[in-house]
Amino acid sequence: MSNNTDLSPVHVIGGGLAGSEAAWQIAQAGVPVVLHEMRPVRGTDAHKTEQLAELVCSNSFRSDDAETNAVGVLHAEMRLAGSLIMACADAHQVPAGGALAVDREGFSQAVTARLEAHPLITIEREEITGLPPTEWGTTIIATGPLTAPSLAEAIAAETDADALAFFDAIAPIIHFDSINMDVCWFQSRYDKVGPGGTGKDYINCPMDKEQYEAFVAALIEGDKTDFKEWEGTPYFDGCLPIEVMAERGPETLRHGPMKPMGLTNAHNPTVKPYAVVQLRQENALGTLYNMVGFQTKLKYGSQTGIFKMIPGLENAEFARLGGLHRNTYLNSPVLLDNVLRLKSRQTLRFAGQVTGCEGYVESSAIGLLAGRFTAAEKLSQAAVPPPPTTAFGALLGHITGGHIVTDDEPGKRSFQPMNVNFGLFPPVDVPKPEGKRLRGKEKTIAKKRALSARALADCRNWLSLY
């Protein structure tokens, strides 16, 4: 680390996981940083301490398996990049099987201590109530899902009232290669060809009356998650949870998101489906499909069991399960460029969950990238995005435009927060053992290992550029 104290400081707003990581990366590159955190001057309903990088929910950073799990690959890439968050997590881990879980107090205290001790980091405990003044120059906004209302209003005014969401309505996402296409078929309703469409843009899963009635009953009986007190999230008709719709009457779903009109079963064209579940392409790669209209507050265990009742999804592998909760985040693919700058004001960069990533590790990773991009610019170097084959690049690609934009569901945003998963990675050729054809689980594991190995190799090459 070399000190460039003649440089004006970078300002980072928000001392959560992303802001802490961004500040660390910038300072480690030799650039001074001012980290602004509003706690304890102003608290939130979720935070309990004034520590930086406080974990407000789980203490788990999820799987640490860097061979067959995408978040484990992200862990490994972050360690390669000198992540403060991963270093403190490793130092304060607690037993959790194959997962990386931490002593939450020890972890946050360690992050705070490291940042406070860094000679190039100044921590200001104050609330930032609006967008930064122009004299601040380069600024990273990493204010997270509980962004203070005054700052959220300022961001909305700068971008667009429709560009900032305050709740996410998340439908489950399924890996395409786990869908049984002997049961399902491609078709848009009434074969409609929309912008960029072909008339065969949806995967359709048919149900007869008996299957539909059993499915509706399971939705109603399934275990639900309650809102946390601080979320205060209202239901609104544009994105009602699927189980709430089911409770409104036995026919509600088949006249709503599961209506069969305009669809003909390609495998059995003479039999009209009683109801149809539609899946829509989620990413440009075509590796992920989301369940249209299936935002839900069902507990995860209930979701997997109930949704596998759907014909064609009996062996479904979920890249993400559904949810509906309080979350302030940008319509990032529209607003941000490929190095996380606001297109309309390039001195502003966003990081963390406010960009539309989901999870502790993902938020930290985007903070890491924002920090590295910013430091490079301050040092008159090129800010080079990571390759899309890396976990860093796959996650960044989702945020800055890898999803498919749709306008066919009133009241819903097509861009929704996402955890890192292998469906975001470009496909890879899986090496086959000589004289052996891989099938089933063996093939899936081989594919994940190939994606992981490529990601880590490409990440090392990318890091050598900095």
Curated annotation (Swiss-Prot):
FAD binds at G14, G15, G16, L17, A18, G19. Catalyzes the folate-dependent formation of 5-methyl-uridine at position 54 (M-5-U54) in all tRNAs. It is an enzyme of class 2 (transferase). Its main location: cytoplasm. Its cofactor is FAD. It is found in: Cytoplasm. One of its GO terms (molecular function) is flavin adenine dinucleotide binding. The keyword Transferase applies. The gene is trmFO. InterPro entries: FAD/NAD-bd_sf, MnmG-rel, MnmG-rel_CS, MnmG_N, TrmFO. Belongs to the MnmG family. TrmFO subfamily. Its EC number is 2.1.1.74. The keyword tRNA processing applies. GO terms for biological process: tRNA methylation; tRNA wobble uridine modification. This is Methylenetetrahydrofolate--tRNA-(uracil-5-)-methyltransferase TrmFO. One of its GO terms (cellular component) is cytosol. It comes from Brucella suis (strain ATCC 23445 / NCTC 10510). Keywords: Cytoplasm, FAD, Flavoprotein, Methyltransferase, NAD, NADP, Transferase, tRNA processing. HAMAP family: TrmFO. Pfam families: GIDA. It comes from the Bacteria. It catalyses: uridine(54) in tRNA + (6R)-5,10-methylene-5,6,7,8-tetrahydrofolate + NADH + H(+) = 5-methyluridine(54) in tRNA + (6S)-5,6,7,8-tetrahydrofolate + NAD(+); uridine(54) in tRNA + (6R)-5,10-methylene-5,6,7,8-tetrahydrofolate + NADPH + H(+) = 5-methyluridine(54) in tRNA + (6S)-5,6,7,8-tetrahydrofolate + NADP(+).
